[in-house]
DNA sequence: ACACGATCCTGACTGC
DNA sequence: TGCAGTCAGGATCGTG
């Protein structure tokens, strides 16, 4: 489900409900995630107060008095703040009970997500190797150009690599390359500085638009408040294989790149 | 170092 | 209706 915009929409939706709340209980119904949830999570968390909810790439960091709870939504995860006695759905794997009768509930059918306690996640290999945030000034065309020299990898895979830049998954990689007129199959090392400058600006614009529209709702992604994200209506490439290009009217084509569905316009993208 | 495929897991959907 | 096959927004690991 979530790329950077969906994670950021989640963060914005729940951060104010979490700030200064005290954790009064924890229930792990199924701790078998990408890595096992800490077995003693309740002992570790109960009594601590929540200071902030921060995002780094597609990771969320819940800052508590004595450390941080690292959260990742994987492909199918979601995180909501609910009244404590809200009925359970299947795959509601972790509940963190808060004062004021609320619960922070982690839901993840495919269990590719993470819920892990630690004291310094920024030093952990999971986060330490991440590339820049797309909204940071060091993410720009010159950076992409420099980093891509000599690389034969298709530019789409290069853009989705979270050591290049964090947060750009399959949907937004497709959209950014479409809007930039760059063929996703083109070798990353053979794209000009000028085109990378356009691509970097486009990535930022696409992600910002998606956040402003509440993210992209496919299948079950909804806001923390249950609303849908409307960026799906703005998708020009992703999910539109076989339909006509909004720019030139030709038929959009689909190929698989690094195992991921890739949609592009053979006429507009080079 | 680099690029790719397989893999973790469940659910939705397709076609027979 | 049922069953097999395919695919899905991520990230890591092993391979050549």
Identify the role of each PLM range.
Residues 1-270:
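Structured catalytic/nucleic-acid-binding cores of DNA maintenance enzymes
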